A protein has these predicted regions:
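Intrinsically disordered, low-complexity boundary segments flanking structured domains
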Residues: 22, 47-54, 160, 259-261, ...
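Substrate-binding/active-site clefts of carbohydrate-active enzymes
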Residues: 50-58, 67-247
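Short loop/turn segments at secondary-structure transitions that flank enzyme active sites
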Residues: 10, 69-72, 109, 278, ...
Length: 311
């Protein structure tokens, strides 16, 4: 177990932080990082070799979205483990003829009611359900049964928990120092500074990490609309226009384009999916013609209309 003990010259702040790049973390509510080096041997070569045809945009997608903490319980007080899910979940998806499963965020997070959308351990599968190699086995089993794996990924904001990324070295290292751009009023969380190269590199390396080390077939990027607009959930006087006088977050847009160009050029057969709830143009058009570069976009209107109909 370890943490970084930081004594900053900024206001003489002393703090202890979890490692932002830790591969494994203590089970919440504990917050230390854990030295970990798994030696998992993948058995999904057939899927990976043929993924480019199975996971392409001209193929049908039937996606089952799942929150691992509430899908099933081993008993009333115990989560099912990644290893349990490798049996029960795979069998269920096959019986229901789903082509893909989308995991709501499985990166480490401190607060259960957030459903995983407020991350502190971007490089670590949450220890709630087991070890990193156990999650790899779950992905492996899904691939061996021709089921693609999409991960919810949250580059839009992060929580203010003391051990997390916020005010990391006594300064706004990851978040934008301007609260009009660096604080999310809805979620009471911090917003990444997309204009800082080191922050962009952190996030893009994290996307690459999950696609590479965990064989993810796609990333569903959360809360894209909140990234695109400077006035998202802000009243007049609470935001500052960009250099052109409008409400688009040019730094975030540039980051999203760079992200999509990077992952599509680095990994064959993957897809990125935008959860974008407005009418922003060209979300799933190529960057080369001015688009954001996503492969797909959630049809948010259909989702809300369908849920309203059933409820």
């Amino acid at each position: 177990l370890y943490k970084y003990k930081i004594h900053s010259h900024n206001n003489n702040i002393k703090t202890e932080k979890a490692d932002p790049f830790a591969r494994y973390c203590q089970h919440p509510p504990n917050t230390a990082s854990v030295v970990w080096d798994d030696a998992y041997k993948w058995k999904d070569k057939t899927w990976m070799d043929t993924r480019e045809t199975k996971n392409s945009l001209d193929k049908p997608y039937s996606v089952y979205e799942i929150h691992l903490g509430s899908w099933k319980r081993a008993n009333e007080d115990k989560f099912m483990s990644y290893l349990d899910l490798a049996e029960d979940l795979v069998q269920y998806l096959k019986e229901m003829n789903f082509t893909h499963v989308e995991f709501m965020p499985i990166m480490e997070y401190p607060y259960d009611p957030s459903w995983g959308y407020q991350l502190t351990g971007y490089f670590a599968p949450t220890s709630r359900f087991g070890k990193p190699e156990d999650f790899k086995l779950l992905v492996d089993k899904l691939h061996q049964n021709d089921i693609g794996v999409i991960l919810d990924w949250v580059p839009s904001h992060f929580p203010e928990d003391a051990h997390g990324l916020g005010f990391f070295d006594g300064s706004c290292l990851y978040e934008n120092p301007d609260r009009r751009k660096g604080y999310h009023p809805d979620w009471k969380s911090l917003i990444f500074n997309y204009g800082r190269n080191e922050v962009r590199a952190f996030l893009i390396s994290n996307a690459n990490f999950w696609l590479d080390q965990f064989h993810a077939d796609g990333l569903r990027v959360d809360a894209v609309a909140s990234m695109l607009y400077l006035d998202y959930s802000r009243e007049e006087g609470e935001w500052e226009p960009n250099i052109y006088g409008n409400n688009e977050n040019l730094e975030a847009i540039s980051f999203i384009r760079e992200l999509n160009q990077e992952v599509y050029s680095s990994f064959k057969g993957i897809q990125t999916i935008a959860e974008e709830s407005t009418s922003f143009s060209m979300v799933s058009k190529p960057v080369s013609i001015g688009g954001l570069g996503f492969g797909m976009k959630w049809m948010m209107g259909w989702m809300h209309d369908t849920l309203e109909y059933f409820m």
